Design a protein with these regions (language model features):
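Proline-aspartate-enriched helix->loop->beta-strand connector
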Residues: 97, 103, 108-122, 138, ...
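Alpha-helical, coiled-coil/dimerization segments enriched in small aliphatic residues
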Residues: 206-233
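C-terminal motif of bacterial Sec signal peptides marking the signal peptidase cleavage site
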Residues: 11-14
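Extracytoplasmic substrate-binding proteins
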Residues: 28-31, 128-204, 227-229, 278-333
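Extracytoplasmic strand-loop-helix segments at the start of, or within, the mature domains
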Residues: 24, 29-37, 42-81
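Bacterial signal peptide processing site
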Residues: 16-18
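A short, structured surface patch at a secondary-structure boundary
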Residues: 56-111, 119
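Short helix-initiation/N-cap motifs at beta->coil->alpha
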Residues: 34-36, 94-109, 146, 230-238
Length: 333
């Protein structure tokens, strides 16, 4: 990870700025992040840097975008992300929001400090950056939800940290009710179709195991994860995929032709029958956000087309409107 170590020279001034835990008064806002670490603020954050796309998405759902003063660079460099986040925030459309890092590769500590954040939201895997920021007295809320329970805790905690707790309650109440509705519609399926999920960018042999967000999506959709491994992100070989022989192959930001070009996979029934589906545009299906419910709805319809339970157009409109409010109109254009 390319972290700018020269930022350590700013340690003394940052520690004296009052951001440290020792300066927090009684009655502070206290939440626990994915690491199990307490994050404390004396009042709701006015200046937040968000370096994790799922959490940035959540900020707009929470109507907390007015607190965002920095984002991850990937929002600008990924054409699909830029297209939709531009619709959520004119500052992104004009490329005015500073981008001091990426969610998984690099973080510029000096640029973060220059923005004088009250809070930095960052992927828990960025351990070096987190350590430096916390050593410099910056409050860090680490994220990387692996299931709905953790995602709900993340939304609730960020709501508290940004003064949008009531909106967080609204979001979670709607989401829980919608998830119950989806489960009720899919629970009758006895013979579940098997689905293999391939990671983005043509990584056909990188998949999601039983302990993953996509597996949770599969269960909600009433399908079975073809991957039998208990781990989150296994890498497999062609022989293993052939032995699983899934009914459908689900792709993310990958051209199906990349799959069809792999001659060794021509024996798969999903390939023979062209049962390959791409969730696109990916913005509407991000499993690291509350939009996992829409991904499940579409996957269910794709797998059980003869007995569709959901109107995709109506559900997209309903879900996005409840998640984003008035901003959903621009997203759905």
């Amino acid at each position: 990870m390319a972290v700018v170590l020269s930022a350590c020279l700013l340690l003394l001034s940052a520690c004296n700025s009052g951001n440290g835990e020792s300066m927090v008064a009684d009655g502070a806002i206290v939440v626990t992040d994915i690491r199990g670490k307490e994050v404390r603020l004396s009042e709701p954050a006015d200046r937040v840097i968000v370096l994790y796309q799922g959490a940035l998405d959540g900020m707009y759902m929470l109507h907390a975008e007015h607190t965002v003063v920095g984002i991850q660079n990937n929002i600008y460099t990924n054409p699909v992300s830029f297209k939709y986040f531009s619709k959520l925030d004119p500052r992104i459309a004009r490329k005015e929001l500073p981008a001091p890092g990426n969610w998984e590769t690099s973080t510029n500590i000096e640029s973060i400090l220059a923005l004088k954040p009250d809070l930095v939201i960052i992927a828990s895997g960025q351990t070096d950056a987190i350590r430096l920021l916390e050593d410099l007295g910056i409050q860090v809320f680490a994220v990387s939800p692996q299931n709905n329970a953790q995602l709900f805790e993340e939304i609730e905690s960020i709501g508290k940290l940004t003064g949008t707790s009531e909106r967080a309650k609204e979001l979670l109440a709607y989401t829980r009710a919608k998830l119950d509705e989806i489960r009720e519609a899919t629970k009758h399926i006895e013979h579940k179709k098997s689905v293999y999920y391939a990671w983005s960018g043509g990584r056909i042999y990188a998949t999601s195991g039983q302990n993953s967000r996509m597996n949770e999506c599969f269960e909600l959709a009433g399908v079975r994860n073809a991957c039998t491994f208990a781990i989150d992100q296994p890498n497999i070989n062609p022989e293993t995929l052939i032995s699983w022989d899934p009914d459908l192959i689900l792709l993310w930001s990958t051209n199906p032709q990349e799959l069809y070009n792999k001659k060794e996979l021509s024996v798969l029934k999903a390939v023979k029958n062209k049962n390959v589906h791409v969730l696109e545009p990916p913005f509407f299906y991000d499993p690291h956000t509350l939009k996992i419910m829409y991904a499940a709805i579409e996957l269910h319809n794709v797998c059980y087309g003869e007995n569709e339970n959901f109107d995709l157009v109506e559900n997209r409109r309903e879900i996005m409107t409840n998640l984003y409010g008035a901003k959903a109109t621009a997203l759905l254009e």
